[in-house]
């Protein structure tokens, strides 16, 4: 499969706004990006969505039956519904009929399907979800991982997260020399719980990881770090808190601006600024999180994703495929491969 024409399997039935917004984002991606899109799901619903967006061009549809609902336990759901859209999409990658999967559906089901269908990369004990957030420096983002795949971690897992994050930052985000930090309660090497202390020692000894020290919560969005490593419990809380703060900030601006600068006139003048602020803070701009460490490219988008977010998720998938992120991770892990033993 050529790097300039990646084939992306899109779970058309996953997400709060499926299939309409999923299809809309996929159609735009096919038109504007050098990708082939395979829409996976109910053919009738997908055809209806394509027609709704006045798109008469032929698009490849891969039939699937059903979806893993949000209330379902992930592992039992994917085993009970082998023809569910996320399972079919993952199988396309496994069988080399697609290069990547994009899904805004049940994130737990997507992770479980990826592990069962694609498997882990050699040398990776626990895959991680990487999420990209904006920073105070315009045009610069920070990659945080893990943000939900592993609530309990060992130091060795965090070392692997740091390796994967370094590669992602270099080849997908375009950072020549990523600065990697360990999320902690203080900058000093002696700070933190047992996991943080032992992880710090491992990271500073690994010459493949450009580790620069601990990152406090206030540093996350400062632009000081390109990659921040933490366990999935802390990372998930951090991610959702950051999203909530962004939404609150935008809402406050919407409410307060009409009260000053002569009301509606002032608001109209500031609309371009507000649009730029929203663009910098909106998670839709980054498309979703890349599940790093599985034998394939898998983008897990926000459940509330609409067309712009799906478009960006497909763009992200294409970049990961074109830059051979999975192969680069596997090559790096060969150089530091050590079995995980109790306590590490």
Swiss-Prot record:
One GO term of the biological process aspect: phospholipid biosynthetic process
One Pfam family matching this protein: FA_synthesis
Q: What is its EC number?
A: 2.3.1.274
Pathway field of the UniProt record reads:
Lipid metabolism; phospholipid metabolism
Concerning SUPFAM superfamilies, the annotation shows:
Isocitrate/Isopropylmalate dehydrogenase-like
Recorded family membership: Belongs to the PlsX family.
The UniProt keywords, alphabetically, are: Cytoplasm, Lipid biosynthesis, Lipid metabolism, Phospholipid biosynthesis, Phospholipid metabolism, Transferase
Q: What does this protein do?
A: Catalyzes the reversible formation of acyl-phosphate (acyl-PO(4)) from acyl-[acyl-carrier-protein] (acyl-ACP). This enzyme utilizes acyl-ACP as fatty acyl donor, but not acyl-CoA.
Supply the name of the protein.
Phosphate acyltransferase
Can you provide one Gene Ontology molecular function annotated for this UniProt record? phosphate:acyl-[acyl carrier protein] acyltransferase activity
Q: Which domain of life is it from?
A: Bacteria
The record lists the catalysed reaction(s) as: a fatty acyl-[ACP] + phosphate = an acyl phosphate + holo-[ACP]
Quaternary context: Homodimer. Probably interacts with PlsY.
Gene, per the UniProt record:
plsX
* GO CC terms, sorted: cytoplasm
Q: Where in the cell is it found?
A: Cytoplasm
